[in-house]
Amino acid sequence: MASQTLVVFQASNQSQLPPPNATLCDGAQEAWHLLHKVLPTCVVAICSGGLLGNLFVLSVFLVPRRRLNAAEIYLAHLAASDLVFALGLPFWAETIRNGFHWPFGAPLCRVVNGVIKANLFISIFLVVAISRDRYRALVHPVASWRRRRRRHWAQATCVLIWTAGGLLSIPTFLLRSVQVVPELNVSACVLPFPHEAWAFVRTVELNVLGFLLPLAAILFFNYHILAALRGREQLSRTRCGGPRDGKTTALILTLVAVFLLCWTPYHVCAFLEFLLHVRAIRGCFWEDFTDLGLQYTNFFAFINSCLNPVIYVFWGQLFRTKIWELYHRCLPRKLTAVSSSRRKEIFQIFWRN
């Protein structure tokens, strides 16, 4: 999924760049050395997994020539968002490896960071939309729209989400620039704030619009989803279509839990950065903790983009069924000596949890 920044260097000189001449807390230099040495390799590995995994997920959703239902539309868009985000990771890895030197020029500085910023919002807004769709299907099944209307609503919602992500990333596209940082002897891709008030605006945008409000909606929807599942467990076993709905809901609940686990530490560190900027907290410990924390929690958030395909395969029984459908379509007719039912039985045994 998306990250707010590759490198942040504000006009006030508060940054994620390591301050070389400042007095560091014990162990900070070693922590920065470890970051420059180990993190780029890990990011490249995550990039590879994210690209391959999300391409596979999209192929499973889009190759079969049939209409996707509402839940599948949202999940396909989430995979597309993760895929676009993963494309920006090699730039971040190379920047860390070079000690925060940006060798790719100003246009890519704006484009790469703008796309990553947009996908931060797109990913969490999609998780909200997915949770809301399950909420309507399970908590208000009678009032839930017909399948066709739900599909159209899902398509329109995804268009609005991608548009909102693009609009919220406009300041990044406009303000990002490559500037010389004499203290580090590098030309860094930085985000200089034109006014001190921008620090507050950025915090509202990132932590409130990009996390707290969506988090409240996600918790609300999923609390009621879990309550509905507990109250209707017996009914779901006998109702036509119940097992399919339950499988989809289990997959989505897992995606939501992993998403929050990966992204919450980053937003905590981003808020601490704001507190440092306004001098609400001070001191060597908080500066080093926040600067290093933003880098490492960025990496932890990156893991989400390659974990989602793994969740689809190992927790999503419905997704595995779609893989079987794709396999059945692509299977050469010459191999029909084994009965279709037998091949499906073998395939299901292979994927059994």
Curated annotation (Swiss-Prot):
GO terms for biological process: cyclooxygenase pathway; G protein-coupled receptor signaling pathway; inflammatory response; response to mechanical stimulus; smooth muscle relaxation of the bladder outlet. Its main location: membrane. Residues 63-72, 132-154, 229-251, 317-353 are cytoplasmic. Residues 1-41, 94-110, 176-207, 273-295 are extracellular. It comes from the Eukaryota. It comes from Sus scrofa. Keywords: Cell membrane, Disulfide bond, G-protein coupled receptor, Glycoprotein, Lipoprotein, Membrane, Palmitate, Receptor, Transducer, Transmembrane, Transmembrane helix. This is a receptor for bradykinin. Could be a factor in chronic pain and inflammation. A lipid is attached at C330 (S-palmitoyl cysteine). This is B1 bradykinin receptor. It is found in: Cell membrane. Gene3D superfamilies: Rhodopsin 7-helix transmembrane proteins. The chain crosses the membrane at residues 42-62, 73-93, 111-131, 155-175, 208-228, 252-272, 296-316. GO terms for molecular function: bradykinin receptor activity. One of its GO terms (cellular component) is plasma membrane.
